[in-house]
């Protein structure tokens, strides 16, 4: 049986799903892409206005109905609450860092005063304003080509994108600066894909399990636990970044931050813990943020 892989129709989404198709074929399972249009592809309003799950719910609906056998999501878009209808597999993560694409090869520090920078992500807006309060931050939606085209046309001086997206479509050389997590922290699970199938489809569960990458899975779980504990959606100004000890992988370091949208304040905490118990570490760091007053920064966004 040929597996139908549900995916959004953008270049990035089909490229991501195509890598999963190719990996499944490598393991002897035929697969093909099944394009699904989501509300987030049609409505260009800021994501926080449309609602959590705007990119993922339509894919889950066709998966649950049996119209497709597998759904591929960007994991950072997936609601943090576990859905028992589905089995989740997380393959190897791409580079989780944030990237700037600016005119004339400029870095963030080199952008002129009052430069126009495009992004709609509150997490990016708040961190950019903390570093460069003079910048004019403008809303930005659309696919990668559309976003970068606003720089090429001169409408914007720069845009902020996930570096993983650029690398997946072969445009990593367009980045004029890539930020380490201690400069601009990425979204929880940024760079990771979430592959779902129906939990009772045992044959497909077995096939997808061959793609599981344990280190990526536990890192993403730790980061997303922070988001879940804060009761914040994927559009909240919350960032998180987990790393595993390079030698044994037994020790995980998790850093997470909550930011004021105007860049005037931030809370950032880190902790180390057992890499095999990512939820506990996520809960610990989230509690540190809560105790320090995270709710005051999240406001009615949580």
From Swiss-Prot:
Binds 1 dipyrromethane group covalently. The keyword Acyltransferase does not apply. This is Porphobilinogen deaminase. Pathway: Porphyrin-containing compound metabolism; protoporphyrin-IX biosynthesis; coproporphyrinogen-III from 5-aminolevulinate: step 2/4. GO terms for biological process: protoporphyrinogen IX biosynthetic process. Its EC number is 2.5.1.61. It is an enzyme of class 2 (transferase). The keyword Transmembrane helix does not apply. It catalyses: 4 porphobilinogen + H2O = hydroxymethylbilane + 4 NH4(+). Belongs to the HMBS family. Its cofactor is dipyrromethane. GO terms for molecular function: hydroxymethylbilane synthase activity. Tetrapolymerization of the monopyrrole PBG into the hydroxymethylbilane pre-uroporphyrinogen in several discrete steps. It comes from the Bacteria. The porphobilinogen subunits are added to the dipyrromethane group. Monomer. The gene is hemC. Keywords: Porphyrin biosynthesis, Transferase.
């Amino acid at each position: 049986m040929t597996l139908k892989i549900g995916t959004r129709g953008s270049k990035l989404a089909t490229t991501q799903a195509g890598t999963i198709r190719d990996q499944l074929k490598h393991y002897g399972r035929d697969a093909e892409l099944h394009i699904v249009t989501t509300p987030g592809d049609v409505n260009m309003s800021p994501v926080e206005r449309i609602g959590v799950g705007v990119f993922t719910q339509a894919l889950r609906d066709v998966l649950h109905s049996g119209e497709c056998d597998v759904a591929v999501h960007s994991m950072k878009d997936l609601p943090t609450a576990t859905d028992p209808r589905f089995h989740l597999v997380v393959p190897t993560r791409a580079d989780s860092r944030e990237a700037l694409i600016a005119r004339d090869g400029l870095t963030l520090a080199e952008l002129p005063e009052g430069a126009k920078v495009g992004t709609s992500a509150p997490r990016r807006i708040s961190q950019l304003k903390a570093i460069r309060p003079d910048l004019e931050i403008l809303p930005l939606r659309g696919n990668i080509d559309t976003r970068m085209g606003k720089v090429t046309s001169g409408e914007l001086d720069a845009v902020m994108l996930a570096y993983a997206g650029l690398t997946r479509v072969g445009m990593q050389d367009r980045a004029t600066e890539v930020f380490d997590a201690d400069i601009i922290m990425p979204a929880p699970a940024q760079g990771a894909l979430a592959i779902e199938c129906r939990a009772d489809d045992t044959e497909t569960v077995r096939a997808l399990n061959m793609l599981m990458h344990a280190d990526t899975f536990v890192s993403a779980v730790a980061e997303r636990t922070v988001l879940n504990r804060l009761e914040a959606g994927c559009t909240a100004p919350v960032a998180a970044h987990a790393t595993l000890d390079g030698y044994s992988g037994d020790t995980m370091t998790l850093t997470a931050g909550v930011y004021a949208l105007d860049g005037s304040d931030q809370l950032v905490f880190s902790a180390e813990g057992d890499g095999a118990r990512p939820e506990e570490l996520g809960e610990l760091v989230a509690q540190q943020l809560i105790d320090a007053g995270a709710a005051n920064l999240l406001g009615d966004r949580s």
